[in-house]
């Protein structure tokens, strides 16, 4: 019988080299083909663990981009009803990060919230030096709440807010501070009085309540005179600023009374000994609330109340790598 030259003489002859590359001939008595040996178990386990780690990191990144607002009512004894319900939006440790285009995730989380003022407690720029997310946040907050006051303090990882090392750029203030000011945020360098129906609430830093005013006055005046004699515009601007906030702090302390409400902003939470060592009647001893950053926990909407009979902690999952100890107060 005539066969075409190209026709296979055996069923196995029809396998291409690509098919047979994964097989080898068996010993006589076995099957004609058998698979090559599989990868060792240890290698497969290692690959599985690496894939699991990558999946965990991806999940953590996604979770850390999720924005949720915790609402906390703070009871303050003997607070006048005029201040009842005064609400602070507390944000900290942005660290130069963006949450969606133009901080859209933060906007979505805050769009139905009502607040009277915003406090930013440090590390908003951090060592990254990227201030644009902070600027976008400030602009977005003003769009949500036109005219809302925004107060900020630096964190331990932020560039110094003022230093003569910035003088080459034409100002002794850090570029991130100048940019935030232009967008309507205020660096809290002296106590700020917030008044409702003749009753006062003070926003301050705890350090401003324990300054040796007379010693610092002498020091700042001497620095100012030296700057004038040196005719350095940046040095004059910085020393004049120091004298200004010291004078404003002195005037504020003269107005403070025992009936006022005191809220301190700080980045690193004060030590227990620092708070316990505040004697009755001292300005530091008057503090009703301390708002801190540093531990990168929740963002809070704090509502003041004189009638709150209980305290509620609102917790949420914020990723696999979060602070070791939750901070409450």
Positions of predicted regions on the chain:
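N-terminal membrane-anchoring alpha-helices
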Residues: 2-82
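Acidic/histidine-rich helix-loop elements
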Residues: 61, 88-104, 124-133, 160-171, ...
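Active-site-proximal beta-strand elements of phosphoester/diester hydrolases
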Residues: 85-95, 200-210, 263-267, 329
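Membrane-embedded segments
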Residues: 86-186
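Catalytic metal-binding/acid-base residues of hydrolase active sites
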Residues: 95, 125, 157-158, 192-193, ...
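Short, Asp-centered acidic motifs that coordinate Mg2+ and/or phosphate
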Residues: 117, 151, 185, 201, ...
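Binuclear metal-dependent hydrolase catalytic cores centered on His/Asp/Glu-rich metal-binding motifs
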Residues: 162, 182-184, 197-262, 272
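Conserved beta-sheet core of the metallophosphoesterase superfamily
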Residues: 269-329
């Amino acid at each position: 019988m005539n066969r075409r030259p190209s026709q296979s003489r055996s069923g196995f002859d029809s396998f291409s080299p690509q098919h047979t590359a994964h097989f080898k001939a068996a010993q006589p008595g076995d099957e004609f083909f058998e698979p090559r040996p599989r990868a060792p178990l240890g290698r497969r386990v290692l690959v599985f663990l690496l894939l699991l780690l990558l999946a965990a990191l991806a999940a953590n990144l996604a979770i850390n981009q999720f924005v949720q607002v915790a609402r906390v009512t703070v009871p303050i004894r003997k607070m006048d009803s005029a201040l009842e319900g005064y609400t602070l939006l507390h944000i900290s440790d942005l660290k130069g990060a963006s949450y969606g285009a133009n901080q859209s995730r933060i906007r979505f989380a805050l769009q139905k919230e009502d607040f009277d003022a915003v406090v930013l407690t440090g590390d908003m720029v951090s060592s990254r030096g990227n201030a644009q997310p902070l600027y976008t946040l400030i602009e977005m907050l003003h769009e949500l709440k036109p005219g809302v006051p925004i107060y900020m303090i630096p964190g331990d990882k932020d560039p110094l807010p003022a230093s003569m090392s910035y003088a080459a750029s034409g100002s002794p203030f850090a570029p991130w501070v100048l940019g935030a000011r232009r967008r309507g945020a205020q660096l809290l360098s002296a106590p700020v009085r917030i008044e409702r129906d003749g009753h006062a609430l003070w926003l301050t830093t705890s350090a401003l309540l324990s300054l040796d005013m007379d010693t610092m006055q002498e020091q700042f005046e001497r620095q100012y005179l030296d700057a004038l004699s040196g005719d350095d515009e940046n040095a004059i601007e910085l020393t004049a600023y120091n004298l200004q906030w010291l004078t404003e702090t002195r005037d504020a302390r003269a107005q403070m009374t025992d009936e006022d409400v005191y809220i301190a902003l700080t980045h690193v939470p004060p030590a227990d000994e620092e708070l316990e060592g505040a004697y009755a009647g001292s300005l530091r001893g008057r503090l009703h609330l301390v708002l801190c950053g540093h531990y990168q926990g929740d963002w809070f909407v704090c509502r003041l109340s004189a009638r709150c009979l209980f305290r509620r902690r609102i917790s949420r999952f914020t990723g696999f790598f979060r602070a070791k100890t939750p901070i409450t107060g």
